């Protein structure tokens, strides 16, 4: 377990009232939620092998993600209240349970803190060889959008995991359309891998910026012109050494300059 003791758990949940004599510690109440949250982290964000090799500072991000996710899951099942001093547990008649609205607000705050930590950790993990070869690393490496910041670019108040999951299929669809019809699958795959490996060059970064900008505009339902897509092709053509895969791709054939040859056998032959 990433979070092993009640003391460690309480480091991430401020201002929790002390348990009364005979009451189970908060850790015991949340243990099943902590296990689910850690499993979710290992599948979606950071596997256990990668976590074990992280620095203490980066492990703190993973721990915060687990606690905030577990707390979000647990709140409806716990006797928690939100007091002027922070979170509390209803352990005697001196504490009044929080309203439904305040509990909802508390859950929203846990998700906000979780997602901020997810975004920070994902950005840190790029270039980590263990993570790159892991299940979550390979999953993130399939898309040109490899963090949660796109949700903020599309109008959300902060990076949002739920927003990202709600739009990932649309993002992947746009990415595939751009790859097949304009930048080529080979170039798109290479850009995704460069992002994952944290080896993006300045020239690659400019093309990634163009692709990301088009995707953001499409998600925001802003008008995107074909000129934006043509600019990507022209940019690739201007940098053939960097994007050498493009010239031999099926996509490049779509942009070849064909010359019509007037043959005598043709019915429309003219001199």
State what each model feature region is.
Residues 1-63, 77-271:
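Conserved short "hinge" loops at termini or chain/domain junctions
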Residues 66:
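Catalytic-loop motifs flanking and including active-site residues across diverse enzymes
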């Amino acid at each position: 377990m990433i979070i092993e003791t009640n003391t460690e758990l309480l480091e991430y949940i401020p201002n929790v009232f002390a348990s009364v004599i005979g009451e189970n510690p908060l850790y015991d109440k949340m243990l099943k939620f902590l296990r689910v949250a850690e499993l979710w982290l290992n599948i979606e964000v950071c596997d256990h092998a990668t976590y074990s090799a992280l620095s203490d500072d980066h492990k703190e991000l993973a721990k915060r993600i687990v606690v905030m996710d577990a707390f979000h899951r647990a709140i409806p099942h716990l006797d928690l209240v939100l007091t002027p001093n922070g979170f509390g547990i209803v352990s005697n008649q001196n504490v009044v349970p929080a309203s439904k609205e305040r509990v909802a607000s508390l859950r929203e705050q846990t998700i906000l803190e979780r997602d901020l930590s997810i975004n920070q950790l994902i950005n840190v993990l790029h270039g980590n060889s263990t993570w790159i070869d892991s299940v979550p690393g390979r999953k993130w490496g399939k898309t040109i959008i490899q963090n949660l910041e796109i949700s903020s670019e599309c109008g959300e108040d902060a990076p949002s995991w739920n927003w990202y999951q709600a739009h990932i299929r649309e993002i992947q669809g746009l990415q595939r359309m751009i790859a097949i019809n304009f930048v080529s699958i080979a170039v798109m795959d290479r850009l995704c891998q460069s992002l994952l490996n944290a080896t993006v060059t300045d020239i690659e970064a400019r093309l990634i910026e163009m692709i990301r900008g088009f995707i953001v505009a499409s998600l925001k339902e802003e008008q995107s012109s074909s000129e934006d897509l043509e600019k990507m092709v022209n940019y690739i053509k201007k940098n053939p050494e960097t994007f050498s895969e493009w010239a031999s791709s099926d996509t490049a054939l779509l942009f070849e300059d064909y010359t019509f040859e007037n043959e005598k056998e043709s019915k429309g032959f003219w001199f």
